[in-house]
Amino acid sequence: VKLSEEQKFVIKEIIKLKKSVQVLSGYAGTGKSTVIKHLVELLPNFAVCAYTGKAANVLRSKGMDAKTIHSLIYKAYTDEDKKVYFSLASSLDYDGIIVDEASMVSEGIYKDLKYFEKPIIFVGDHGQLEPVGDKFNIMSEPDYKLETIHRNAGEIAHFAEYIRKGYKPSSWEVRNGGGEKIKFVQKNSHKSACMNVDQIICAFNKTRAEMNSFVREKLGRKTSMPEKDDRVMCLKNDRLCGLFNGMQGVVREIYADDMFLFESENNALSIYYDPNIFNQVKYEIDHDQEAPSPFDYCYAITAHKAQGSEFEKVLVLEQRCDLWDHKRWAYTAASRAKELLYWCDM
């Protein structure tokens, strides 16, 4: 891949390692992965990792030996009852760390990464939404920015840029004709598109709860409680158990006493879940370490929860709210889709 001048400059500056923590930010389609690949070649003993297994898989598909942050810096141990726990590794056999999808890194994980006193390069996207309720945001002041969308970045990246600049999604169709990867859905027919996608993204929790109930009903679920093969998402970080806020997986078995086997991209864990959280519009999460883990269905999620994840086929239900910048919201939602994007103005 031929590097642009912008990419060359960024790579040249970063490898000088002038600061212990450097932040590189780039919009979707600016070639961040290409830059990471070159950094890995120039800094051979740097570990490459990402917050989710999904993001690590994307890097692996591009030829990098990527891990999740969790598998890189936490080590598993088993207690007398054969329960598996995780604790921070005592040392790291690398000269430094490159972290992709850095917008998802919480303050706690940031501190754990810094513990090893190695140079860290965070890579993320300053166009995405700011984390909700979290004052901490690695991407708020990047050292370097990639802002040129590459011609071959694909239709979805160009569409995401178009709406980030404030243009109406509906005018894209008029301007560009019907593309292969973006389909516009009429307001009343969004439910028919639901079952054709891997992820529904909306703005409001009320819509999220409604859409999750609708999809589960279509799938033949009999109760509001989790059943085998339900898709669920963890709602709080629990480093000890290896769970992270926003981590998606599938229920493989249901046990007595509100316990299920949760299979994520990393592993399968038997977990006590909180039955009162499912289908709630507003979550009342108990942050006590001893409390059962909060999960909810994730057929539909909000754009804030979708940050940093990528899905093959996505349905976006566009909804406006004064609490955040709508252009950033729409950009974040659109850029989650990899192969096919259905867009519905609600």
Give the positions of each predicted feature.
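Conserved ATP-binding/catalytic motifs of P-loop helicase motor domains
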Residues: 1-346
